[in-house]
Amino acid sequence: MNEWTPIWVNLILILAVLFAFAAMLSWIERRLLGLWQDRYGPNRVGPFGVLQIVADSIKLLTKEDWIPPFADRAVFVLAPAIVAVTTLLAFAVVPIAPGIGVVDLNIGVLFFLAMSSLGVYSIVLGGWASNSKYPLLGGLRAAAQMLSYEVFMGLALMGVVMLAGSFNLRDIVAAQENLWFCIPQILGLATFAVAGIAEARRLPFDLPESENELVAGFHTEYSSMKFGLFFIGEYVGITLISAMIVTLFFGGWLGPVLPPLAWFLLKTFIVIICFVLLRAALPRPRYDQLMTYGWKVMLPVTLVNLLLTGAVVLSVA
C-alpha cells in the first residue's frame, strides 16, 4: 500500500485481519492450553478443531438477547460496545508495516494511552448497569486495577519516548534500526508487559471476573453477542498489547530477509504465545496482592527506569 491508498481501504483490511487474528487466537489459546495441561483441546469441529470458533460464534449469535428487568437498559446495552470500540481505536495508531496502518499520528503513544484508559468505562458501566452485587464488585475491582496499572504503563513508555525523541510510533520503530529498545529498556519492557496483562484483564490478573469469587464478575448478567463483544474486546486487547510491545521494544517490522509485514506478524504472534504461557503457568493472586505489587514494586521500578534513561540521554547529549 502506498501513501495514495484511501484510508478506508487500510481501515477495512486491518479490521478484517484483526478480527480474524483475534478469532484464531481463541482457538490457538485453547489448543496450547490443552497441550501444556496434558489434555485435549478443541478437536471435534473441523480439522484439529479449527472451526470451533465458527461454532462458538453461531452459538452466541443464536442465544436469546436477554436484558435483566432490573438493569439500567440503555447503559447495559452501551457498555459492551465501548470496550470493543476503544480497543479498536487504540489499534488505529499501530504501524504494522511501511505504508500499512490506519493513521499516522505524531502523538501516537499518547493516543494509545488515552484510548486504553477509556476502556475502564465499559467495565464499570457494565457492572453498575447490571444492578447486581457480583457485577458491581467486578466493576469496582476493574476500576481500581485498570486505573492503577495505566499509570505504570504510561511511565514504562516514557523511557522509550526519551530514547526515540518522539511520540510517533513510526519514528520509534525507525529509531530501533541499530538496536532494539528491549535491551536498554529491559525494565520498561517488563513493567509494560505486566501492566498490559492487567489492563487486558487476562490471567493471572483477571480479578474483575474471577469465577471462584464473583461468578463471572462484571459480565455475569450478559448473554448473547453482548457477552461476545466483551470476549472480542479481550482478545483484541491482548493482540493490541502484543503489537505495542513489538512496536516499542522489538523493532516493529524491522528484520532481515522476510518482508516487513511478515516480521511484524511473527513477532506479535510470539509475544501472544508468551502471554498464553503465562496464563497456563501462573496462579491468580489475591486482589490486595495485585494492588500492593503495583504501587510498591511497579511504581518504583518504572521511576528508576525513567531516571536511568534520563541520565543516559543527558550524558550522551
From Swiss-Prot:
<comment type="function">
    <text>NDH-1 shuttles electrons from NADH, via FMN and iron-sulfur (Fe-S) centers, to quinones in the respiratory chain. The immediate electron acceptor for the enzyme in this species is believed to be ubiquinone. Couples the redox reaction to proton translocation (for every two electrons transferred, four hydrogen ions are translocated across the cytoplasmic membrane), and thus conserves the redox energy in a proton gradient. This subunit may bind ubiquinone.</text>
</comment>
<dbReference type="Pfam" id="PF00146">
    <property type="entry name" value="NADHdh"/>
</dbReference>
<keyword id="KW-1278">Translocase</keyword>
<feature type="transmembrane region" description="Helical">
    <location>
        <begin position="147"/>
        <end position="167"/>
    </location>
</feature>
<dbReference type="GO" id="GO:0009060">
    <property type="term" value="P:aerobic respiration"/>
</dbReference>
<keyword id="KW-0520">NAD</keyword>
<keyword id="KW-0874">Quinone</keyword>
<keyword id="KW-0830">Ubiquinone</keyword>
<dbReference type="GO" id="GO:0005886">
    <property type="term" value="C:plasma membrane"/>
</dbReference>
<keyword id="KW-1133">Transmembrane helix</keyword>
<dbReference type="GO" id="GO:0016655">
    <property type="term" value="F:oxidoreductase activity, acting on NAD(P)H, quinone or similar compound as acceptor"/>
</dbReference>
<feature type="transmembrane region" description="Helical">
    <location>
        <begin position="74"/>
        <end position="94"/>
    </location>
</feature>
<keyword id="KW-0472">Membrane</keyword>
<comment type="subunit">
    <text>NDH-1 is composed of 14 different subunits. Subunits NuoA, H, J, K, L, M, N constitute the membrane sector of the complex.</text>
</comment>
<feature type="transmembrane region" description="Helical">
    <location>
        <begin position="7"/>
        <end position="27"/>
    </location>
</feature>
<keyword id="KW-0812">Transmembrane</keyword>
<keyword id="KW-1003">Cell membrane</keyword>
<feature type="transmembrane region" description="Helical">
    <location>
        <begin position="107"/>
        <end position="127"/>
    </location>
</feature>
<keyword id="KW-0997">Cell inner membrane</keyword>
<feature type="transmembrane region" description="Helical">
    <location>
        <begin position="297"/>
        <end position="317"/>
    </location>
</feature>
<feature type="transmembrane region" description="Helical">
    <location>
        <begin position="257"/>
        <end position="277"/>
    </location>
</feature>
<dbReference type="InterPro" id="IPR018086">
    <property type="entry name" value="NADH_UbQ_OxRdtase_su1_CS"/>
</dbReference>
<dbReference type="InterPro" id="IPR001694">
    <property type="entry name" value="NADH_UbQ_OxRdtase_su1/FPO"/>
</dbReference>
<feature type="transmembrane region" description="Helical">
    <location>
        <begin position="179"/>
        <end position="199"/>
    </location>
</feature>
<comment type="similarity">
    <text>Belongs to the complex I subunit 1 family.</text>
</comment>
<dbReference type="GO" id="GO:0003954">
    <property type="term" value="F:NADH dehydrogenase activity"/>
</dbReference>
<dbReference type="GO" id="GO:0048038">
    <property type="term" value="F:quinone binding"/>
</dbReference>
<protein>
    <recommendedName>
        <fullName>NADH-quinone oxidoreductase subunit H 1</fullName>
        <ecNumber>7.1.1.-</ecNumber>
    </recommendedName>
</protein>
<feature type="transmembrane region" description="Helical">
    <location>
        <begin position="230"/>
        <end position="250"/>
    </location>
</feature>
